[in-house]
């Protein structure tokens, strides 16, 4: 807590003209993130996710310990690093959230509406699904992103995601690539990674899910992308969104080889 307050104080004291203060601002923001990462609040949500994974729940009163996240029933370590991927039992490509919802339905007996009712966290109201994603993601910490593209439907989703990334749409004629398709782009004090290149994609994708300080809770990658689409004034995506999963697939494929540091921490 003391470190967080010190970091906020440092951030608040930035002065000078925008041009002269720019580099100093980014240095202070980097220090701020370092201080916060030392006691990432996401760790508490991660612990809750593990408990939810192991606790019998739902109409069938069973746990999720036999849920297959792509590496076999109950195998969690390294699974997040290889998602999204194609699942034969569902006949489609799924990311971690879509797969957990599937397991909650098929194994625990929850309805789709019940499993997705609170799919994202709000300040003071944590989502069970987000907690599960946070824990699953943490089990791939230190592993390289390695999304499979062997199945035709996986390759199809990568192409679809690439199309969505570069498509300009909506009343503002806006798209992902406007902000994230070139080097040196910034919004206010926020440097924007070039996600069309491997280096930028690795840097961005390796720290999700992440605790967002400005929101006071953990955001998943699907939540982040859905919100990006909202900000671009695109049609609202219904969770879990195949379009968003395709975009995730494209970005994770671009980020191949990046080492996960999950859960991360963001502004």
Region locations from a protein language model:
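Electron-transfer interface patches adjacent to heme c in soluble/periplasmic c-type cytochromes
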Residues: 21-44, 54-69, 73-131, 141-142, ...
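Bacterial N-terminal signal peptides
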Residues: 3-15
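Hydrophobic, well-structured mid-protein blocks that either form specific transmembrane helices
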Residues: 132-139, 148-149
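An amphipathic alpha-helix/helix-turn recognition signal
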Residues: 44-45, 156
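Sec/Tat signal peptide C-region and signal peptidase I cleavage site
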Residues: 15-21
């Amino acid at each position: 807590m003391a470190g967080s307050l010190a970091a906020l104080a440092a951030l608040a004291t930035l002065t000078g003209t925008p041009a002269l203060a720019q580099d100093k601002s980014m240095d202070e923001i980097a220090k701020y993130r370092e201080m916060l990462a030392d006691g990432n609040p996401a760790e508490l949500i991660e612990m809750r996710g593990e408990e939810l994974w192991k606790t019998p729940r739902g109409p069938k009163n069973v746990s999720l310990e036999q849920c297959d996240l792509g590496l076999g029933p109950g195998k969690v370590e390294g699974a997040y690093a290889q998602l999204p991927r194609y699942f034969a039992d569902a006949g489609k490509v799924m990311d971690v959230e879509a797969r957990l919802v599937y397991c909650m339905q098929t194994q625990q007996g929850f309805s789709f509406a019940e499993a997705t009712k609170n799919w994202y966290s709000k300040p003071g109201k944590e989502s069970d699904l987000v907690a599960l994603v946070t824990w699953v993601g943490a089990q791939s910490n230190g592993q390289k992103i390695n999304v499979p593209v062997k199945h035709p439907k996986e390759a199809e989703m990568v192409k679809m995601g690439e199309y969505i990334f570069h498509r300009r749409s909506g009343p503002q004629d806006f798209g992902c690539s406007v902000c994230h398709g070139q080097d040196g782009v910034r919004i206010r004090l926020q440097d924007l990674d070039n996600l069309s290149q491997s280096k930028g994609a690795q840097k961005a994708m390796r720290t999700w899910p992440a605790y967002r300080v400005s929101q006071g809770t953990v955001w998943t990658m699907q939540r982040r992308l859905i919100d990006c689409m909202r900000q671009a004034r695109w049609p609202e995506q219904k969770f879990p969104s195949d379009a968003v999963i395709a975009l995730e697939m494209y970005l994770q494929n671009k980020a191949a080889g990046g080492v996960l540091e999950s859960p991360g921490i963001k502004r």
